[in-house]
Structure formats: C-alpha cells, structure tokens
C-alpha cells in the first residue's frame, strides 16, 4: 500500500473524480474545524493527515478505511454551527452506511469503521472516564468479543489524534489505557459467575448484570493501581 495515500486523493480531487466516486469524502475540503483542536483547520486536510499517519504506522487496510471515513458527518454540519461539529459522529455513521452499501465494502472494514465513526470522540476522552463508563465504552466497541478488532479501533483513533498539525509525534496514552482496561475486563471469570448464579436460581438478564458489575469492579481495582503509580 502507498506510503503517502494522500497523494492519490490529491490527484482524484484535481481531476474531479473524487466527487464522483466518494462525494462524502470530497465535500470535507473547505469545512473548518476549531483551531484549538485542529490547527490545520480544514477537515479535508486533517483527513489526509490521518490517512498518511495510518500509512506511516503500517496499519491494515481495515484501519486505513476507518481513518478515511471517520469524519464524514463534518461535511453535513449546518453552516451556522461551524466550526463546531456537534453530533457529527452519528451523521458520520449514517453516511458511512450508505457509502458501504454503494461500494459493497467488506463487512470487516464496514463494522470497524462504524465503531470508529461513532466512538472516536469518546475514545479520545477516555482518560476522563471512570470504571463504569470505561466498561460501557468497551462493550459498545464489542471489545470483549473482538479484542483484535478493538486494537485496530484504538489504532485508528491514534491516527486521528496524531493526524493534526503539530501532533504527529504526540503520545496517545488512550490506546494503552483502554487496552489495559480491556485486560482487566477479560480477567473476570464469567463462567464462574454464571455457574454460581445458576446454583442460586438466578437466570437471564440478572446474570448479565452480575457479570457487568464484576467487570466494573475489576476495572475500578485496576484504576486504583494506576492512580498509585
């Protein structure tokens, strides 16, 4: 894959092909973002920086696709809201669905990109979250069932954070933090909890609630150890 995929998109834009093939992406150029978060300002420029960062970190096609489409909703932000993009995550997911159906994007790419589009803001802010919110975030990302994909989601978010003017060498502690939080969640012996629940006559949703509570306790205990460090 290309070392600097942005060059291909430059060519596609110059010849007018991008607005035909990927109009959802093409409309991002010229859309301003808040300079305190995005010194590069232009959403299209940011997108190319993210994509080039994904190439620099030698990511998979799945991660690169997620990077390409994570901010589609910013292209439909009402003009009177700019440069803020409130709710762009949900708009991105809706636009992504149509794009994937039109281009017949493989399921793995589509599902990973959908999570990144919906959750990248929450992942960026994960350093502010407590145990319960961290577990809910991991569950929404389906990180417990699909840990390898969860790591790709986190990598795409790192590319997003570092794909900004002046941030290309910045650390992204959120990735390690959420990976460690997932490890704490995975340490919970769910089969033991389910067996004990069955012995007590507890079934159905209550068992799920018990497992969720145990996961929150495990993450809370892990957070205490990180605070001590």
Give the location of each predicted region:
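Conserved, hydrophobic alpha-helical core segments of structured domains
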Residues: 1-157
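Charged substrate- and nucleic-acid-binding regions of tRNA-handling and nucleotidyl-transfer enzymes
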Residues: 147-229
């Amino acid at each position: 894959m290309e070392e600097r995929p942005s060059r291909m998109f430059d060519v596609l834009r110059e010849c007018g092909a991008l607005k035909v093939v990927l109009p959802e992406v093409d409309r991002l150029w010229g859309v301003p973002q808040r300079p305190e978060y995005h010194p590069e300002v232009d959403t299209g420029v940011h997108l190319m920086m993210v994509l080039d960062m994904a190439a620099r970190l030698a990511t998979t096609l799945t991660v690169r696709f997620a990077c390409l489409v994570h901010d589609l909703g910013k292209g439909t932000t009402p003009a009177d809201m700019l440069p803020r993009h409130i709710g762009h995550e949900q708009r991105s997911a809706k636009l992504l669905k149509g794009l994937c159906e039109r281009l017949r994007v493989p399921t793995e790419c589509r599902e990973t990109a959908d999570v990144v589009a919906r959750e990248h803001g929450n992942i960026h802010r994960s350093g502010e979250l407590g145990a319960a919110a961290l577990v809910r975030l991991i569950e929404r990302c389906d990180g417990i069932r699909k840990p390898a994909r969860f790591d790709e989601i986190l990598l795409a978010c790192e590319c997003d954070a570092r794909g900004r003017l002046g941030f290309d060498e910045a650390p992204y502690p959120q990735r390690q933090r959420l990976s460690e939080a997932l490890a704490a969640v995975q340490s919970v012996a769910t089969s033991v909890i389910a067996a004990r629940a069955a012995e007590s006559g507890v079934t159905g949703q209550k068992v799920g609630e018990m497992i969720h509570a145990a996961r929150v306790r495990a993450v809370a205990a892990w957070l205490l150890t990180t605070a001590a460090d």
